[in-house]
Amino acid sequence: MGCLGNSKTEDQRNEEKAQREANKKIEKQLQKDKQVYRATHRLLLLGAGESGKSTIVKQMRILHVNGFNGEGGEEDPQAARSNSDGEKATKVQDIKNNLKEAIETIVAAMSNLVPPVELANPENQFRVDYILSVMNVPNFDFPPEFYEHAKALWEDEGVRACYERSNEYQLIDCAQYFLDKIDVVKQADYVPSDQDLLRCRVLTSGIFETKFQVDKVNFHMFDVGGQRDERRKWIQCFNDVTAIIFVVASSSYNMVIREDNQTNRLQEALNLFKSIWNNRWLRTISVILFLNKQDLLAEKVLAGKSKIEDYFPEFARYTTPEDATPEPGEDPRVTRAKYFIRDEFLRISTASGDGRHYCYPHFTCAVDTENIRRVFNDCRDIIQRMHLRQYELL
């Protein structure tokens, strides 16, 4: 009996030793995970719908992951290539859908605008009828006649005139880009370029995380849908955020949001920025402000058809600040416009600032890879300081 008791105690002793070793391993792994977690910079991309948030994420993949070779930059080249091929095939369909939506939206708007727009060539009416007839066809297979009709309509001066009034209806930003490329997109062996993939518009629904590394520093970037019904999901991402990148479509000063076809898009962005800046959960989180779509803003300002003061009367009294630094060769009208928009946001951050968080504005063009590379490099020091402050190391 005594021997049996000692044997049992030995078993217990071995079991306890094994348990202690297992606990040590778990504790070591937890400490390692904690170190990795604390060393990771978590960036939350916020902004109103169609401001360019998802395009910023795509640029991070081009610059810091592995381009569009799979979601996570796989180490296995074959797996990466397989993912890349599958993703690009999906994107071809998305690009074709963008092209179809663009021509449908423009020709459908022609009769609805006040005053309406007529075709320059009335013989193209049968082409309009065709485009409208396939508008709601599910799983559309893009036959050759679709491209033929779309191209002929895009070359019609009446359709172009309707496109010029696109601020009066809801049209995706990439409409002209893909309509100009009909002959390329229609090819059976068409493979999208990085620029095509950057321009492609797909509505973001839910929360998407992109992980990348820059100079051995880990970044997690969270892209959240910007439409009003998506914003209730944002609160899920607020915990342990290093910084917020707030993206604004600067060119949207003469447009209205899709959700109600009434609210000015830039005013919506200003209201949203104010609510985030004053949010009690975010009072210590600084905001990097991406004043995006500078290329489209410049086009609108120089075209002179939609004046900012018609939508924001205070612009008439605005003068370009002395510390403004225009881009080389930039028209003074463009400089004045972009700094006015910048200062509208800075008025919000300075009016309610308590010194616990700051706003860092940058002028961006999300489809320009070099611009985003330069801006993100400029932001890295800011993000690093925020991260050190977050863990009270600064």
UniProtKB/Swiss-Prot annotation:
Any one Gene Ontology BP term: adenylate cyclase-activating G protein-coupled receptor signaling pathway
Compositionally biased intervals (Basic and acidic residues): 8-23
Mode of membrane association: Lipid-anchor
Region described as G2 motif: spans on this chain: 196-204
Claim: Magnesium is one of the keywords in the record: yes
Lipidation (S-palmitoyl cysteine): C3
G3 motif: annotated segments: 219-228
Stretches the record annotates as G4 motif: 288-295
One GO cellular component, as annotated: heterotrimeric G-protein complex
Keywords: Cell membrane, GTP-binding, Lipoprotein, Magnesium, Membrane, Metal-binding, Nucleotide-binding, Palmitate, Transducer
Region (G5 motif): 364-369
PANTHER family to which the protein is assigned, alphabetical: GTP-BINDING PROTEIN ALPHA SUBUNIT, GUANINE NUCLEOTIDE-BINDING PROTEIN G(S) SUBUNIT ALPHA
Assembly mode: Heterotrimeric G proteins are composed of 3 units; alpha, beta and gamma. The alpha chain contains the guanine nucleotide binding site. Interacts with CRY1; the interaction may block GPCR-mediated regulation of cAMP concentrations. Interacts with ADCY6 and stimulates its adenylyl cyclase activity. Interacts with ADCY2 and ADCY5. Stimulates the ADCY5 adenylyl cyclase activity. Interaction with SASH1.
Homology family: Belongs to the G-alpha family. G(s) subfamily.
Protein's UniProt name: Guanine nucleotide-binding protein G(s) subunit alpha
Designated gene of the protein: GNAS
